[in-house]
Protein backbone atom coordinates (compact mmCIF):
# COMPACT_ATOMS: atom_id res chain seq x y z
CA UNK A 1 0.00 0.00 0.00
CA UNK A 2 1.49 3.34 -1.02
CA UNK A 3 1.71 6.40 1.22
CA UNK A 4 -1.00 8.30 -0.66
CA UNK A 5 -3.49 5.47 -0.17
CA UNK A 6 -2.62 5.30 3.52
CA UNK A 7 -3.29 9.02 3.90
CA UNK A 8 -6.59 8.77 2.02
CA UNK A 9 -7.93 5.76 3.91
CA UNK A 10 -6.50 6.29 7.40
CA UNK A 11 -9.25 6.84 9.98
CA UNK A 12 -8.66 4.48 12.88
CA UNK A 13 -6.74 1.33 13.74
CA UNK A 14 -6.44 -1.28 12.36
CA UNK A 15 -6.12 0.51 9.02
CA UNK A 16 -7.96 -2.17 7.01
CA UNK A 17 -10.61 -2.91 9.67
CA UNK A 18 -11.13 0.04 12.03
CA UNK A 19 -12.42 -0.69 15.51
CA UNK A 20 -15.30 1.76 14.99
CA UNK A 21 -16.95 3.46 11.99
CA UNK A 22 -17.12 7.10 11.00
CA UNK A 23 -20.12 9.05 12.27
CA UNK A 24 -22.58 10.57 12.60
CA UNK A 25 -23.22 8.75 15.88
CA UNK A 26 -26.97 8.60 16.52
CA UNK A 27 -28.50 7.15 19.70
CA UNK A 28 -32.11 5.95 19.83
CA UNK A 29 -33.91 5.37 23.14
CA UNK A 30 -30.88 6.42 25.17
CA UNK A 31 -31.91 5.99 28.81
CA UNK A 32 -30.31 7.78 31.76
CA UNK A 33 -30.50 7.49 35.51
CA UNK A 34 -28.67 10.52 36.90
CA UNK A 35 -28.17 10.89 40.65
CA UNK A 36 -26.81 14.28 41.67
CA UNK A 37 -24.97 14.34 44.97
CA UNK A 38 -22.95 16.70 47.11
CA UNK A 39 -19.28 15.83 47.69
CA UNK A 40 -16.09 17.36 49.12
CA UNK A 41 -15.10 20.52 47.27
CA UNK A 42 -11.42 19.89 47.96
CA UNK A 43 -11.67 16.54 46.16
CA UNK A 44 -13.25 18.24 43.14
CA UNK A 45 -10.59 20.94 43.05
CA UNK A 46 -7.90 18.27 42.71
CA UNK A 47 -9.35 16.82 39.51
CA UNK A 48 -11.15 19.55 37.54
CA UNK A 49 -8.60 20.94 35.05
CA UNK A 50 -8.00 24.62 34.41
CA UNK A 51 -9.33 26.69 32.69
CA UNK A 52 -12.60 25.06 33.81
CA UNK A 53 -14.08 26.38 37.05
CA UNK A 54 -16.24 24.52 39.54
CA UNK A 55 -19.90 25.50 39.43
CA UNK A 56 -20.77 23.85 42.76
CA UNK A 57 -19.65 21.05 45.06
CA UNK A 58 -21.83 18.44 43.31
CA UNK A 59 -21.30 15.44 41.04
CA UNK A 60 -23.75 13.81 38.65
CA UNK A 61 -23.43 10.03 38.78
CA UNK A 62 -24.84 8.52 35.58
CA UNK A 63 -26.00 5.10 34.50
CA UNK A 64 -26.78 5.14 30.75
CA UNK A 65 -28.45 2.41 28.70
CA UNK A 66 -27.84 2.63 24.94
CA UNK A 67 -29.72 -0.15 23.13
CA UNK A 68 -29.45 1.34 19.62
CA UNK A 69 -26.39 3.39 18.69
CA UNK A 70 -24.96 3.90 15.21
CA UNK A 71 -21.81 1.85 14.77
CA UNK A 72 -21.42 1.21 18.50
CA UNK A 73 -24.30 -1.23 18.96
CA UNK A 74 -26.04 -2.08 22.22
CA UNK A 75 -24.22 -1.22 25.44
CA UNK A 76 -24.37 0.36 28.89
CA UNK A 77 -22.20 3.00 30.52
CA UNK A 78 -21.68 4.45 33.99
CA UNK A 79 -19.59 7.30 35.36
CA UNK A 80 -19.25 10.74 36.89
CA UNK A 81 -19.66 14.20 35.38
CA UNK A 82 -19.02 17.45 37.22
CA UNK A 83 -20.88 20.74 36.67
CA UNK A 84 -18.39 23.45 35.65
CA UNK A 85 -18.13 26.84 33.99
CA UNK A 86 -16.00 27.75 31.01
CA UNK A 87 -15.61 31.46 30.32
CA UNK A 88 -18.60 32.06 32.55
CA UNK A 89 -20.93 29.64 30.77
CA UNK A 90 -22.25 26.38 32.29
CA UNK A 91 -21.26 22.90 31.16
CA UNK A 92 -20.05 19.60 32.57
CA UNK A 93 -16.62 17.99 32.83
CA UNK A 94 -16.65 14.24 32.11
CA UNK A 95 -14.46 12.74 34.84
CA UNK A 96 -14.89 8.97 34.53
CA UNK A 97 -16.71 6.49 32.29
CA UNK A 98 -17.01 2.70 32.49
CA UNK A 99 -18.67 0.61 29.77
CA UNK A 100 -18.97 -2.89 28.36
CA UNK A 101 -18.37 -2.43 24.62
CA UNK A 102 -15.06 -2.07 22.76
CA UNK A 103 -15.99 0.18 19.77
CA UNK A 104 -17.23 3.11 21.90
CA UNK A 105 -14.25 2.68 24.24
CA UNK A 106 -11.79 2.87 21.34
CA UNK A 107 -13.70 5.53 19.41
CA UNK A 108 -14.45 7.59 22.48
CA UNK A 109 -10.82 7.70 23.58
CA UNK A 110 -9.29 8.18 20.12
CA UNK A 111 -11.66 10.78 18.64
CA UNK A 112 -12.87 12.91 21.56
CA UNK A 113 -10.76 11.87 24.54
CA UNK A 114 -13.47 10.25 26.66
CA UNK A 115 -12.01 8.75 29.88
CA UNK A 116 -13.41 5.30 29.15
CA UNK A 117 -12.49 1.98 30.79
CA UNK A 118 -13.87 -1.53 30.33
CA UNK A 119 -16.23 -2.64 33.11
CA UNK A 120 -19.71 -4.10 33.67
CA UNK A 121 -22.43 -1.48 34.17
CA UNK A 122 -26.12 -2.40 34.26
CA UNK A 123 -29.29 -0.28 34.19
CA UNK A 124 -32.57 -2.13 34.65
CA UNK A 125 -35.95 -2.06 36.36
CA UNK A 126 -36.35 -4.29 39.43
CA UNK A 127 -40.12 -4.40 40.11
CA UNK A 128 -40.79 -0.79 41.22
CA UNK A 129 -37.19 0.42 41.30
CA UNK A 130 -34.80 1.69 38.63
CA UNK A 131 -31.47 0.09 39.51
CA UNK A 132 -27.98 0.90 38.26
CA UNK A 133 -24.89 -1.09 39.16
CA UNK A 134 -21.23 -0.92 38.19
CA UNK A 135 -18.87 -3.86 38.60
CA UNK A 136 -15.16 -3.67 37.80
CA UNK A 137 -14.35 -7.29 37.14
CA UNK A 138 -16.17 -9.15 39.91
CA UNK A 139 -16.05 -6.22 42.34
CA UNK A 140 -19.05 -3.94 42.89
CA UNK A 141 -18.04 -0.26 42.88
CA UNK A 142 -21.39 1.57 42.53
CA UNK A 143 -25.09 0.98 43.19
CA UNK A 144 -27.81 3.51 42.43
CA UNK A 145 -31.54 3.12 43.03
CA UNK A 146 -34.50 5.33 42.19
CA UNK A 147 -38.26 5.09 42.46
CA UNK A 148 -39.59 4.23 39.00
CA UNK A 149 -41.30 7.19 37.30
CA UNK A 150 -42.76 8.71 40.46
CA UNK A 151 -43.10 12.26 39.08
CA UNK A 152 -42.84 13.80 35.62
CA UNK A 153 -40.18 16.46 35.12
CA UNK A 154 -40.68 19.68 33.14
CA UNK A 155 -39.03 19.03 29.78
CA UNK A 156 -37.67 22.55 29.20
CA UNK A 157 -34.96 22.56 31.91
CA UNK A 158 -34.04 18.96 31.07
CA UNK A 159 -33.54 19.84 27.40
CA UNK A 160 -31.60 22.95 28.36
CA UNK A 161 -29.17 20.91 30.44
CA UNK A 162 -28.77 18.32 27.67
CA UNK A 163 -27.77 21.08 25.23
CA UNK A 164 -25.01 22.38 27.52
CA UNK A 165 -21.41 21.76 26.40
CA UNK A 166 -19.44 18.81 27.70
CA UNK A 167 -15.68 18.95 28.33
CA UNK A 168 -13.00 16.26 28.16
CA UNK A 169 -9.28 16.10 28.88
CA UNK A 170 -7.83 14.26 25.87
CA UNK A 171 -4.41 12.71 26.51
CA UNK A 172 -2.48 10.63 23.96
CA UNK A 173 1.22 9.82 24.46
CA UNK A 174 3.96 9.89 21.83
CA UNK A 175 5.68 6.62 20.91
CA UNK A 176 8.44 7.44 23.43
CA UNK A 177 5.88 7.88 26.21
CA UNK A 178 6.03 11.67 26.31
CA UNK A 179 2.82 13.69 25.87
CA UNK A 180 1.86 14.19 22.23
CA UNK A 181 -1.73 15.36 22.70
CA UNK A 182 -2.99 17.04 25.87
CA UNK A 183 -6.08 19.10 25.11
CA UNK A 184 -9.31 20.32 26.61
CA UNK A 185 -12.06 19.22 24.21
CA UNK A 186 -15.62 20.53 24.02
CA UNK A 187 -18.50 18.62 22.42
CA UNK A 188 -22.29 18.80 22.28
CA UNK A 189 -25.28 16.56 21.83
CA UNK A 190 -27.59 17.65 18.98
CA UNK A 191 -30.93 16.76 17.35
CA UNK A 192 -32.26 15.82 20.78
CA UNK A 193 -35.74 14.30 20.96
CA UNK A 194 -36.81 14.09 24.60
CA UNK A 195 -39.29 11.24 25.02
CA UNK A 196 -39.69 11.28 28.79
CA UNK A 197 -38.23 12.66 32.01
CA UNK A 198 -39.08 11.65 35.56
CA UNK A 199 -37.84 12.05 39.11
CA UNK A 200 -38.27 10.19 42.38
CA UNK A 201 -36.51 9.21 45.59
CA UNK A 202 -32.95 8.01 45.01
CA UNK A 203 -29.95 6.55 46.80
CA UNK A 204 -26.34 6.06 45.73
CA UNK A 205 -23.54 3.97 47.22
CA UNK A 206 -19.93 4.10 45.99
CA UNK A 207 -17.28 1.60 47.07
CA UNK A 208 -13.48 2.09 47.11
CA UNK A 209 -11.53 0.45 44.28
CA UNK A 210 -7.93 1.10 43.25
CA UNK A 211 -8.65 1.10 39.50
CA UNK A 212 -12.23 2.38 39.47
CA UNK A 213 -11.94 5.16 42.07
CA UNK A 214 -15.47 6.58 41.86
CA UNK A 215 -15.56 6.67 45.68
CA UNK A 216 -12.76 9.26 45.68
CA UNK A 217 -15.65 11.70 45.20
CA UNK A 218 -17.64 10.53 48.23
CA UNK A 219 -21.39 10.85 48.58
CA UNK A 220 -22.24 13.38 51.29
CA UNK A 221 -25.86 14.04 50.31
CA UNK A 222 -28.12 13.07 47.41
CA UNK A 223 -29.71 16.29 46.15
CA UNK A 224 -31.59 15.27 42.97
CA UNK A 225 -32.35 12.39 40.63
CA UNK A 226 -33.67 12.08 37.10
CA UNK A 227 -34.67 9.30 34.72
CA UNK A 228 -34.52 10.39 31.08
CA UNK A 229 -35.35 8.74 27.75
CA UNK A 230 -34.24 10.49 24.54
CA UNK A 231 -32.84 10.21 21.02
CA UNK A 232 -29.76 12.29 20.18
CA UNK A 233 -26.64 12.64 18.06
CA UNK A 234 -23.15 12.76 19.53
CA UNK A 235 -21.38 15.55 17.66
CA UNK A 236 -17.68 15.67 16.93
CA UNK A 237 -15.62 17.91 19.19
CA UNK A 238 -13.42 20.98 19.13
CA UNK A 239 -10.21 21.81 20.99
CA UNK A 240 -10.67 24.81 23.31
CA UNK A 241 -7.32 24.63 25.14
CA UNK A 242 -3.97 23.05 24.24
CA UNK A 243 -1.88 22.32 27.34
CA UNK A 244 1.25 21.73 25.24
CA UNK A 245 1.09 24.94 23.20
From Swiss-Prot:
The active site is at 116 (schiff-base intermediate with acetoacetate). Keywords: Decarboxylase, Lyase, Schiff base. It is an enzyme of class 4 (lyase). The keyword Lyase applies. It catalyses: acetoacetate + H(+) = acetone + CO2. The gene is adc. This is Acetoacetate decarboxylase. Catalyzes the conversion of acetoacetate to acetone and carbon dioxide. The keyword DNA repair does not apply. Its EC number is 4.1.1.4. Pfam families: ADC. It comes from Acidiphilium cryptum (strain JF-5). The lineage of its organism: Bacteria, Pseudomonadati, Pseudomonadota, Alphaproteobacteria, Acetobacterales. GO terms for molecular function: acetoacetate decarboxylase activity. Belongs to the ADC family.
Amino acid sequence: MDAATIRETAFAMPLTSPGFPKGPYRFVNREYMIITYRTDRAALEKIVPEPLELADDVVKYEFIRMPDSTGFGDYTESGQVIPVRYKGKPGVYVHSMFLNDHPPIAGGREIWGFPKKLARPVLEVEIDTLVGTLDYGRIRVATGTMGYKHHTLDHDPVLSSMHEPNFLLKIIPHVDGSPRICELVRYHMSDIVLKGAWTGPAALALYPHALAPVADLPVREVVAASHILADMTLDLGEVVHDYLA
